Amino acid sequence: ISKDDLVITREAKHYRDGYSANLRIHRPHLARRLNELGCVPNKSKILIINDLLKKDMPEELWSHFIRGYLDGDGWCSLKIDKNNKHILGVGICSASVDILNFFQEKLLQNNITSFVYQGRIYSFHIKKCDLEKFYNYLYKDCGDCKLERKYKNYTVYVDSLDKSKS
């Protein structure tokens, strides 16, 4: 690949809590080749969990699957309000409502309430009173297999709840 064949865009943004970087490389030949290898454009819009996976995946693995999805396409944001109270927001974004509805069903089987909203994309939110149950479900036996940044927000939130109870 020669430098002249590429269209490269770079972007860096500064946010209150850090930086975000984005690098995009555009080349028609590269896109065609990736497509030939099975990487399809806009896969998020066509992503489904097929019936075979739903039927054959052992129940104890679904928490790991959902945690991986949260780590990849979700958020766990921690804020402190004007009364110095910690507020945790947890959710997942997707172009596929089906996958979020499936997660909602799976969590409901574990007595965890969630909501699916439609905006420009679909988003999935955990009900505030079930945040602790949700995280216990996700992290109960994950060992080191977690995105530490999101897990840390949860532990800070739970610690703040414990302090407010005492």
Predicted regions and their residues:
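Internal intein/HINT superfamily modules and their associated LAGLIDADG
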Residues: 1-166
